Design a protein with these regions (language model features):
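C-terminal region of N-terminal signal peptides and the immediate post-cleavage residues
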Residues: 7-21
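N-terminal export and membrane-targeting signals
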Residues: 1-3
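Short, surface-exposed polybasic-aromatic patches that bind anionic ligands, especially phosphate groups
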Residues: 18-323
C-alpha cells in the first residue's frame, strides 16, 4: 500500500484532527511516520476521518441485504433513558488492587486472570453484562463480557471473556481472537460519550450492531460471530458512513449546539464500525456510554436517519473468512 493510504488503506481518507482522550489517556493515537502507522489497518483506524474515503463497490449490496433483514431500519441511539440504557465504564487509579477474574467462556482468547476491577464496577444491563475499567496512570483498559461479581476472598469476578488494551498502542488482537465484543474490538473506543459531545466533536467511529452478520471480519476487527456465509451480509469491522448527499441535504434538521447534531456529523466524518450481533431487529443500533446527561428528545432526531442514507467505506483491506 502507498504511504498515502494511511491506516485503513483509504486513498482519500483524512488523518484524524485530534486523538480522542478518556481519563487523560489518548485512545489509540496514530504515530506519524512509525511502522505501526504505515503497516495497514490498526486500532488508530477508529480515529480516521472517512468522509472523503471511496465507497466500496459492493456498498449497494450490503445496504440492500441489511434492509432485507427487516426490524429496525433507522439509526437507533442505544443509550439515554435517564441513565438506563448504554454501556457504563469507570476509571481507577494506582491504588485499585488487582483481583482474580475467572474466565468461563473463552479463556484461550482472553488476556487477563487478574485485573484492577472494583467490586462496585458498573455492569451493563441485559444479557451481555459488559464491564469496562480504565486504569488511568497506565492507560490500560480492561473489558469483560458476561461479567458477574462473585466476591469472597480476593473479591473475584467471573467473565465469559476478557480483553486488555493499552490505549497508547495501536496493535490489533490476534487474528481469530474475540474480546469483550464479538468483533475483537475495544468497546470503549466506539462509545459515544456525553463529555465529547458537550465539547462539540466526536472524533472517532461509533460502534454499531446488526441483527445478522457474515462469518468474516475486516481489520481492525479480528473475530467473527456467525455461521452465515452470505457475501452481502456485513462482516465484523465493516465501516460505513453517511453519504455526501444525505449529510449535506439534512444537516440543517439538527439544531446548532444539539447532541444530535454532533452525533450526526460524526456519522458522516467518522462513520460506524460493525462490532457485534444485535438482538432480533436490532439493526443500526449505535452505542453510547450510560449517562443521565443524554437528552432523549434530542437524540430521537437521529431516528429519522434511514439505514439507506449510509454507504460502505472501501477499506481496501482483505475480508478474512473461512467461507
Amino acid at each position: 500500500m502507498g504511504a498515502a493510504l494511511l491506516v485503513l488503506g483509504l486513498g482519500a481518507a483524512r488523518s484524524p484532527a485530534a486523538t480522542p482522550k478518556i481519563g487523560g489517556c489518548p485512545v489509540f493515537p496514530a504515530f506519524k511516520g512509525s511502522a505501526t502507522a504505515r503497516s495497514g489497518a490498526n486500532q488508530s483506524a477508529w480515529n480516521q476521518n472517512v468522509s472523503e474515503a471511496p465507497v466500496d463497490p459492493r456498498s449497494g449490496h450490503y445496504i440492500a441485504r441489511i434492509t432485507s433483514l427487516g426490524g429496525n431500519q433507522v439509526v437507533h441511539p442505544d443509550f439515554g433513558g435517564n441513565g438506563v440504557y448504554g454501556i457504563p465504564y469507570t476509571t481507577v487509579g494506582p491504588r485499585q488492587r488487582r483481583v482474580r477474574v475467572k474466565v468461563t467462556g473463552y479463556p484461550d482468547q482472553s488476556d487477563f486472570g487478574r485485573a484492577p476491577i472494583p467490586p462496585g464496577a458498573p455492569v451493563e444491563g441485559g444479557s451481555d453484562r459488559h464491564v469496562l475499567v480504565l486504569q488511568r496512570h497506565r492507560c490500560d483498559l480492561f473489558e469483560m463480557y458476561a461479567a458477574h461479581y462473585v466476591g469472597g476472598h480476593g473479591h473475584r469476578w467471573n467473565a465469559g471473556s476478557t480483553a486488555r488494551f493499552n490505549l497508547h498502542s495501536t496493535r490489533l488482537r490476534h487474528d481469530g481472537w474475540t474480546s469483550a465484543d464479538a468483533a475483537g474490538l475495544s468497546i470503549l473506543a466506539g462509545l459515544v460519550r456525553p463529555g465529547e459531545v458537550r465539547r462539540g466533536h466526536v472524533r472517532h467511529a461509533i460502534r454499531v450492531t446488526f441483527e445478522e452478520t457474515r462469518r468474516a471480519y475486516i481489520h481492525p476487527a479480528t473475530h467473527y460471530a456467525s455461521d452465515l456465509c452470505d457475501p452481502d451480509l456485513p462482516p465484523m469491522g465493516l465501516r460505513l458512513r453517511l453519504s455526501h448527499s444525505y449529510f449535506h441535504h439534512n444537516l440543517h434538521r439538527f439544531p446548532a449546539g444539539s447532541q444530535s447534531r454532533v452525533i450526526f456529523k460524526a456519522l458522516y466524518h467518522y462513520g460506524i464500525i460493525n462490532a457485534d450481533n444485535g438482538g432480533t431487529g436490532a439493526n443500526w443500533f449505535i452505542t453510547g456510554a450510560r449517562s443521565t446527561r443524554w437528552h432523549d428528545g434530542d437524540l430521537n432526531r437521529l431516528k429519522t436517519v434511514p439505514g439507506t442514507a449510509f454507504v460502505v467505506v472501501d477499506s481496501r483491506a482483505r475480508v478474512k473468512t473461512p467461507c
